[in-house]
Amino acid sequence: MDISISWVVIIVFVLSYLILMDKWRASKLPGNLPPSPPKLPVIGHLHLLRGGLPQHVLRGITQKYGAVAHLQLGEVHSVVLSSAESTKQAMKVLDPTFADRFDSIGSQIMWYNNDDMIFSRYNDHWRQIRKICVSELLSPRNVRSFGFIRQDEMARLIRVFESSEGAAINASEEISKMSCAIVCRAAFGSVLKDQGKLADLVKEALSMASGFELADLYPSSWLLNLLCFNKYRLQRMRGRLDNILDGFLEEHKVKKSGEFGGEDIIDVLYRMQKDTEMKAPITNNGIKGFIFDVFSAGTETSATTIQWALSELMKNPEKMVKAQAEVREKLKGKTNPDVADVQELKYLHSVVKETLRLHPPFPLIPRLCKEECEVTGYTIPAKTRILVNVWSIGRDPAYWKDPDTFNPDRFDEVSRDVIGNDFELIPFGAGRRVCPGLHFGLANVEVPLAQLLYHFDYKLPSAMTAADMDMSETPGLSGPRKNPLIMIPTIHNPTS
């Protein structure tokens, strides 16, 4: 009995302490915060995040409480931005204030203590690595020069589809392999030996990094950090990642050259690592973090977008017919179409934009407010975590008619681009931290998609109809399909 009473006393003491600390923190906040749902002691609004994907749940909250909403998640204060107006103010007007990232256990472990480009803080290291990435890999000139790689890997994919004619094929798997090969050859000069294992690690890491980890939401609690079992799982994954990347980098050091006959971006990073005048030294972990960036942002997002585009076209057969008619007319007689050729495909561009509207590669964009400021009349305290709900903005009826309907024709009436100029449609982000690889990514979506539509007609397996298609998403930073896309390709014969 004495033991039971002791435990009750301890629990009451701990809860009382946590509640008092919660009230003390709340007293330090400014009075003009964004609207907020009712919260519970200690956990704040954590209970509201149950029962769905984060972007879906957060959309429901902002629909009820306003496009700018304040949430207390454990000890951490967050603000959700779900309108084009608030996002424009944060990412354009106040861009330097919101250009930072916040730390998480997942990014610290898998992205080498954020010594990469995607999760790096807004500092000299980030500016330096981004500049190298854009100039050496992602410039429009380089994107065009990678045309022969896209053509080569597309030819492989077409052969795979041809060999499966009349039979069901896992299109998701084959498209991912193609995307992976294009990125590896363009960035590193060759296909990685353990490319498949690395791709699996990327999917697993992106899935785990997309959720809310309790240890991240209670940073002062050493106990939750100790009991964070996902941390130990991530550390094991990091060990596997190190084995793959260390082996690749050792091979890279002894090889003479890649397929371009000169330096690739890894060579450039190694050369600059020796430069003593660099503002921020480039470490070996920084190079590995960059490689993981290229894989996670370059392969998974492009492959996912192609899969969603094909899924939406299969779900909407009349749109499929229109897209195929345009592609087959404009590309007729062109054996190896690339970026310049697909520029003529107006409806295909609309299909891709509509896909990115409904299925953005980054449904939630994380930022950190560096200093206290004001957004749409509300005070945002310094160090507040920001979540830009790109998925919700793309489905907002204030900007889009019939927002949940796949309708590429809407872009005949509404002129909006996807490169960060129009804040109603920002699948690649905006401002200083807009995705540097967006032109590379778009080329790796549009060219393969055009060829898949040109060469094949498609059916669903068994007795499935378009209405039966599962369009569910699964947790992940890139918003992937819950289930793989299974299709039956039939070779298109223009003379039939």
Curated annotation (Swiss-Prot):
- Protein task: Involved in the biosynthesis of phenolic monoterpenes natural products thymol and carvacrol which have a broad range of biological activities acting as antimicrobial compounds, insecticides, antioxidants and pharmaceutical agents. Catalyzes the C2-hydroxylation of gamma-terpinene to produce carvacrol. Mediates also the C6-hydroxylation of (4S)-limonene and (4R)-limonene to form carveol.
Reactions catalysed according to its record: (4R)-limonene + reduced [NADPH--hemoprotein reductase] + O2 = (1R,5S)-carveol + oxidized [NADPH--hemoprotein reductase] + H2O + H(+); (4S)-limonene + reduced [NADPH--hemoprotein reductase] + O2 = (1S,5R)-carveol + oxidized [NADPH--hemoprotein reductase] + H2O + H(+); gamma-terpinene + 2 reduced [NADPH--hemoprotein reductase] + 2 O2 = carvacrol + 2 oxidized [NADPH--hemoprotein reductase] + 3 H2O + 2 H(+)
Any matching Pfam family: p450
Tissue occurrence: Mostly expressed in flowers and, to a lower extent, in leaves, especially in glandular trichomes.
Q: What class of enzyme is it?
A: oxidoreductase
The name of this protein is Cytochrome P450 71D180
Locate the residues binding heme: 435
Induction: what does the entry report?
A: Induced by jasmonic acid (MeJA), salicylic acid (SA) and UV-C irradiation.
